[in-house]
Amino acid sequence: MDLLKSLEEEQLRKDLPEFRPGDTVKVYFKVIEGNRERIQPYEGVVIRKRGSGLSATFTVRRVSYGIGVERTFPLHSPRIEKIEVIRRGKVRRARLYYLRKLTGKAARIAERR
């Protein structure tokens, strides 16, 4: 069991910023197309964080051309170049699934001070 924990700690990334559900983040994700590799930024609101250790994931939601798009990223993935926290949101829930039903101004999140 100790061997597994030591291997997992070796793989954990320590360069990631602290963020919570409700925060607006920009995730720079490496996309591999054939033999080319490029970095694709994805900006949106974190609606959920789950898990711990290497299996931790987070889901980012954004509205693109009027359609809500959600993408789940593994937190410690080597394909994540970096994560920028754009603004901190003030919410009282850990899972923000209610944002799926809201549109326009109702879907805004107050900024945390």
From Swiss-Prot:
GO terms assigned for molecular function: structural constituent of ribosome
One GO BP annotation of this record: translation
Family according to the record: Belongs to the bacterial ribosomal protein bL19 family.
PANTHER family: LARGE RIBOSOMAL SUBUNIT PROTEIN BL19M, RIBOSOMAL PROTEIN L19
A Pfam family it matches: Ribosomal_L19
Gene Ontology CC terms: cytosolic large ribosomal subunit
TM helices/strands, residue ranges: none
Function: This protein is located at the 30S-50S ribosomal subunit interface and may play a role in the structure and function of the aminoacyl-tRNA binding site.
The protein, known as: Large ribosomal subunit protein bL19
Highest classification ranks of the organism: Bacteria, Bacillati, Bacillota, Clostridia, Thermoanaerobacterales
Keyword vocabulary terms for this entry: Ribonucleoprotein, Ribosomal protein
InterPro entries: Ribosomal_bL19, Ribosomal_bL19_CS, Ribosomal_bL19_sf, Translation_prot_SH3-like_sf
Matching HAMAP family: Ribosomal_bL19
The keyword Ribonucleoprotein appears for this protein: yes
